[in-house]
Amino acid sequence: MAQILQIAAIALATVGTGAATMSVMNEDIPDLQVPEGQWEATGALDGRSFDVLGVDTASGAVLEDLLVFRDDTFQSVDCQNYCDFGWSDYKTKEVDGVIHFTVTTICPDAPHTVVFYGQVNGDDITVDGTWTTRRWYWTNQIVLTATGKAMPDMAQDASG
């Protein structure tokens, strides 16, 4: 019985000092690093939507999505369907006639953060991104890259 009490005391002391927590936590994985610059909320892509096809760079899984811009906000239909991310503010800058954009979306109900960085040149779009899930015991990140084309009009409702 005394041995059981000793083990319980050691376990409580370990948990109480945080030693157990530190031994099981993974280091954080940073979100996608977006290039610095004069990012502004210009609405430059408002009224446009893009059908994109991409891949998870680690697994090769194919990712299909519709990216929608309206009223200075952005929505990934795939993110909306998965976790009700909603509409997020986006920022742009123009470099040599190409519109660069960035947006960070956060799931309100789970620890998911998605960072997009892309370029729109006419009707063509390229996008890089990270989907990071942070929990106290592990961090997982999906790195994605995608390309796509502008949709003819924004008749589709992405409000989810």
Regions from the PLM with identified roles:
Residues 2-20:
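Sec-dependent N-terminal signal peptides
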Residues 29-120, 128-130, 134-160:
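Central antiparallel beta-sheet cores of small beta-barrel/beta-sandwich binding domains
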Residues 21-27:
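Membrane-interface motif at the C-terminal end of an N-terminal transmembrane signal
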